[in-house]
Amino acid sequence: MKNKKRVLIASSLSCAILLLSAATTQANSAHKDSQDQNKKEHVDKSQQKDKRNVTNKDKNSTVPDDIGKNGKITKRTETVYDEKTNILQNLQFDFIDDPTYDKNVLLVKKQGSIHSNLKFESHKEEKNSNWLKYPSEYHVDFQVKRNRKTEILDQLPKNKISTAKVDSTFSYSSGGKFDSTKGIGRTSSNSYSKTISYNQQNYDTIASGKNNNWHVHWSVIANDLKYGGEVKNRNDELLFYRNTRIATVENPELSFASKYRYPALVRSGFNPEFLTYLSNEKSNEKTQFEVTYTRNQDILKNRPGIHYAPSILEKNKDGQRLIVTYEVDWKNKTVKVVDKYSDDNKPYKEG
């Protein structure tokens, strides 16, 4: 009898434990499902927010800003891509409506991408048959077309910059006052700010000394290039050189250091961010701007295999450019593309 009671008690305890375990598992599962659902909803909301942000960024907009009691900003964006040159222009036009200033105000931010178009080529007709074409210079040019009533008053960047990263902030205050500083951030409590930020490791930015009130030009030029454990100047014929018996005319890439070691601006390309501040007399209704993005290429020529033949360097031997003309309607604060063309074998040459 005692043994029967023990069996019944043990059986009851086992059932209770099983029921408790099942309930706990179900509760944990429900809690996990709830957590997963919350997480999914959070992710979905975050993605929707990101989509809204992207959509809002892409739209032309008029927004109030801290530039005076009745000041406002109208933003426009124009994008032009050219497949032949692999160059993209993305321009932001910020119209500043300042009732305390007697002129129209416009900030133009020049963005986009100039792909490197890095190429290894084989030219069997030459002794130095293995060629490397790489982007030694990038150029951005902005000019006002035949209109003296529209003037360029400021630009970013200025002078020469050799740091790996370029950061600057332009600030506009009511009454036509403007200022610019290095770094990112507002320069005063009552202003509209616009920043530029881009990478140029192993390159230098140089603002042309010939810039004036209707024309500005920036050059981004290779300097000392670091790849793997090597550091060589752009003017060195042995730049990216590799003397190896496995290189053949059929495999020109083997005559040079691995491209995965090259600096980003050589391997991938350049993403410019340049800023121009303009004023326009209110009697003038429309102005055209011509914007040119150019890629200059140096050619390095090596002879395949083990040898003592010198390498050959040809600077600015090739180049491609994209030229776009934009028209600004000052009264309606709109922008449109009125002309576009591109060409090869057109490296930029100052003069």
From Swiss-Prot:
SUPFAM superfamilies membership: Leukocidin-like
Biological processes per GO annotation: cytolysis in another organism
Signal peptide start and end residues: 1-27
Coiled coil: none
Keywords, in A-Z order: Signal
A GO CC term attached to the entry: extracellular region
Regions of compositional bias (Basic and acidic residues) in chain numbering: 30-60
InterPro entries membership: Bi-component_toxin_staph (IPR003963), Leukocidin/Hemolysin_toxin (IPR016183), Leukocidin/porin_MspA_sf (IPR036435)
Family: Belongs to the aerolysin family.
Protein name, UniProt field: Uncharacterized leukocidin-like protein 2
Species of the source: Staphylococcus aureus (strain Mu50 / ATCC 700699)
Taxonomic placement: Bacteria, Bacillati, Bacillota, Bacilli, Bacillales
